[in-house]
């Protein structure tokens, strides 16, 4: 189980990313449209002044049940060992173990 503080920090990053999403996207479009380098630097400075945690690359996918940040399956939102336990217990409908 992940620490509550780490899960809370991740939720805070998600809120910041949603808040600054439109601002970051519009300023990136402006950079591509502006021909002069000095104007690009000004817009880039505006991007740099936004909070560091508002960048989408700072987000991690976490396991829904344990909060584990590694080995997550996007389709289920679970980490590998929890996914395996749930499939063995038949708690995930439609998931089957492969055998050949």
UniProtKB/Swiss-Prot annotation:
Q: Which SUPFAM superfamilies match?
A: Glucocorticoid receptor-like (DNA-binding domain)
A Gene Ontology biological process in which this protein takes part is: translation
List locations, semicolon-separated: Plastid, Chloroplast
Alphabetic keyword roster: Chloroplast, Plastid, Ribonucleoprotein, Ribosomal protein, RNA-binding, rRNA-binding
Keyword RNA-binding annotated = yes
The record, for InterPro entries, names: Ribosomal_uS14, Ribosomal_uS14_bac/plastid, Ribosomal_uS14_CS
Q: Which GO terms describe its molecular function?
A: rRNA binding; structural constituent of ribosome
Q: Which Gene3D superfamilies match?
A: 1.10.287.1480
- GO CC annotation terms, alphabetical: chloroplast; small ribosomal subunit
Q: Mainly resides where? A: plastid
Function text: Binds 16S rRNA, required for the assembly of 30S particles.
Q: How does it assemble?
A: Part of the 30S ribosomal subunit.
Q: Which family does it belong to?
A: Belongs to the universal ribosomal protein uS14 family.
Name-wise, this protein is Small ribosomal subunit protein uS14c
- Species per Swiss-Prot/TrEMBL record: Carica papaya
């Amino acid at each position: 189980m992940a620490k509550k503080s780490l899960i809370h920090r991740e939720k805070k990053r998600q809120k910041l990313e949603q808040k600054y999403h439109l601002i970051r996207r519009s300023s990136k479009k402006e950079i591509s449209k502006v021909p002069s380098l000095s104007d690009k630097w000004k817009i880039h400075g505006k991007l740099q002044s936004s909070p560091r945690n508002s960048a989408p690359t700072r987000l991690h996918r976490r396991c829904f049940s344990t909060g584990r940040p590694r080995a997550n399956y996007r389709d289920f939102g679970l980490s590998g060992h929890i996914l395996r336990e749930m499939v063995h217990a038949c708690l995930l409908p439609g998931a089957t173990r492969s055998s050949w």
